[in-house]
């Protein structure tokens, strides 16, 4: 969340940021209108309360002198009624201001390129060579079904479209990737945590999922809990309403993730690229403001390391303003090569939120000058299902079998390949 004082004093900067994000400036216009009315009511309320104090003293003096107090008591009643009206307006305006403030996205960093959509995302680097097949490669869903390691029909039978059952070596591959990723990241210095995946509304608001993305979340209506859309939410909120010590703090976590938007608008309706339930390993950092962009580079390299070890070709792009997430100031997307689609697909987003999430979640640290909000960062390290997609497609052989990347074999009990039985 932005600071109200900053928005009030810099409407042009905030308005330009919204325009660069392909948004209008109506939110800012409404906010400033409510802000003026709110502050006017505060001033009027203070004046009335001062007047009430004066009348209170006058009534006391009249009583002391045994004089009639009826007119002053009536005046006091009128003042109290007016104060109640003003206080109601103050609460109403403040509620409207808070609602708008929670709906204003972060301001893109100066190094975030201005652009309309993903077509304007500049490529930072390309790593690894795309495999040249001597045969026509098959899409991962055909491979998964032929090898009997992915069962889309039974997943749909149990829960509906957008859910998949992993079987046999498919399930083992998914589990192997989770353990492999966590081992790599803990060696990189991240502390592993295993958080809840049922999240309360306050925590969801703290990281920016609410109120904007409420329709994309799964809600347990009876209890008011949301299913975690990403481990970013519970891990970041571990320090909600706290002062942090010994920054930076680096955490990694595996969780199942749940999102309602899978397959929206007809995208990726086949396979496991977009699912309502999927596994992900997350990286989260809490850092001092002056080091946050250096830490973003480190976090991104830490996520990239997984693909390097798996020997999967990928590229790194910087998201432009029109493609930037709601809470982010700057984001790198890591995109893995998917041969049958002949394009790179996002497998991780690594973002610096500056103090946007910390202000919402009230996560601070102490300095000699006074409390400051920390900067938060996170990135997928990686999306596990999409890594399975990349392995099945990039490591497939002409006979239909799939080679297991060498670094995963110890996690697979020595299995070197998956082939049809």
Swiss-Prot record:
Its main location: cytoplasm. It catalyses: tRNA(Ser) + L-serine + ATP = L-seryl-tRNA(Ser) + AMP + diphosphate + H(+); tRNA(Sec) + L-serine + ATP = L-seryl-tRNA(Sec) + AMP + diphosphate + H(+). It is found in: Cytoplasm. This is Serine--tRNA ligase. The keyword ATP-binding applies. The keyword Protein biosynthesis applies. One of its GO terms (molecular function) is ATP binding. Pathway: Aminoacyl-tRNA biosynthesis; selenocysteinyl-tRNA(Sec) biosynthesis; L-seryl-tRNA(Sec) from L-serine and tRNA(Sec): step 1/1. Its EC number is 6.1.1.11.
């Amino acid at each position: 969340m932005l600071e109200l004082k900053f928005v009030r004093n810099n409407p042009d900067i905030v308005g330009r940021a919204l325009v660069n994000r392909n948004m209008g400036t109506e939110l800012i216009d409404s906010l400033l209108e409510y802000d003026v009315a709110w502050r006017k009511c505060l001033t009027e309320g203070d004046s009335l309360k001062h007047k009430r104090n004066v009348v209170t003293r006058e009534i006391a003096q009249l009583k002391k002198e045994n004089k009639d107090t009826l007119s002053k008591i009536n005046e006091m009643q009128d003042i109290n009624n007016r104060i109640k009206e003003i206080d109601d307006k103050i609460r109403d305006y403040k509620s409207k201001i808070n609602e708008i403030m929670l709906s204003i996205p972060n301001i893109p960093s100066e190094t975030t390129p201005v652009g309309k959509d993903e077509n304007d995302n500049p490529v930072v680097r390309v790593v690894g060579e795309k495999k040249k097949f001597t045969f026509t490669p098959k899409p991962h869903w055909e491979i998964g079904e032929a090898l009997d390691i992915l069962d889309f029909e039974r997943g749909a039978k149990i829960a509906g479209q957008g859910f998949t059952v992993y079987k046999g070596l498919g399930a083992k591959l998914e589990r192997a990737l989770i353990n492999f990723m966590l081992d790599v990241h803990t060696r990189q210095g991240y502390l592993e945590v295993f958080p809840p995946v049922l999240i309360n509304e306050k925590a969801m608001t703290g990281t920016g999922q609410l109120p904007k993305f409420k329709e994309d979340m799964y809600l347990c209506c009876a209890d008011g809990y949301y299913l975690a859309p990403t481990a970013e939410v519970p891990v970041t909120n571990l320090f909600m309403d706290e002062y942090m010590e010994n920054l930076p703090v680096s955490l990694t976590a595996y969780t199942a993730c749940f999102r309602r938007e899978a397959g929206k608008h007809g995208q990726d309706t086949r396979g496991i690229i977009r699912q309502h339930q999927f596994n992900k390993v997350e990286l989260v950092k809490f850092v001092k403001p002056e080091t946050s962009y250096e830490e973003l580079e480190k976090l991104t390299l830490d996520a990239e390391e997984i693909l390097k070890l798996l020997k999967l070709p990928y590229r790194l792009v910087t998201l432009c303003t029109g493609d930037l997430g709601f809470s982010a100031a700057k984001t790198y997307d890591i995109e893995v090569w998917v041969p049958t689609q002949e394009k790179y697909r996002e497998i991780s987003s690594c973002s610096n939120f500056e103090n946007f999430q910390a202000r919402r979640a009230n996560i601070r640290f102490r300095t000699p000058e006074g409390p400051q909000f920390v900067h938060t960062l996170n990135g997928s390290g990686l999306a596990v299902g999409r890594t399975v997609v990349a392995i099945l497609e990039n490591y497939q052989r002409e006979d239909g079998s799939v080679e297991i990347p060498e670094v995963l074999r110890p996690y697979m009990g020595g299995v070197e390949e998956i082939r049809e039985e």
